[in-house]
Amino acid sequence: MHWSDSYIDIPHEVLDCAQLVERALHEQFGRTDIHFPRRQADDLAHRSALITGHQADFAERIEEPVDGCGVLMLARGRQAHIGLYCLIQGVPYVLHSDALFGSSMRQPLARLPRCYRVEGFYQWL
């Protein structure tokens, strides 16, 4: 069993992408010091502004991902979606909450939907 198993199929209206990451960091990695700003609107521009405006407060880019690090994704060309990197039996996945899908999921990085593109991997500060 992987630590991410218990975070699959949580409704998006219960935990959006940032809330899912925050909860997993608290519960699985003991990072109770991380509290992301809450979104005030569910639109791409607002989510992107939150991420780009606060990214340096929480994480710094790394070249090689490790289990539990942040995954920043571009959504329609904007830095507007985050998840957690999961390495399971040598296969890289991302755990994230997707509004269109309606819940959280763990997807192989190689099979992300076309609406997402990995911008980079980040270690938590």
What are these regions (language model features)?
Residues 55-56, 103-108:
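Short acidic (Asp/Glu) patches
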Residues 67, 90, 117:
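Residues that flank catalytic or metal-binding motifs in active/ligand-binding sites
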Residues 106-125:
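Glycine- and charge-enriched low-complexity intrinsically disordered segments
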Residues 82-105:
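Catalytic Cys-His active-site segments of thiol-dependent hydrolases/isopeptidases
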Residues 35, 93-96, 115-119:
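Short, surface-exposed linear patches
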Residues 75-77, 86, 113:
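A generic structural signal for short, solvent-exposed coil/turn residues
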Residues 1-62, 67, 73-76, 80-81, ...:
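N-terminal capping segments
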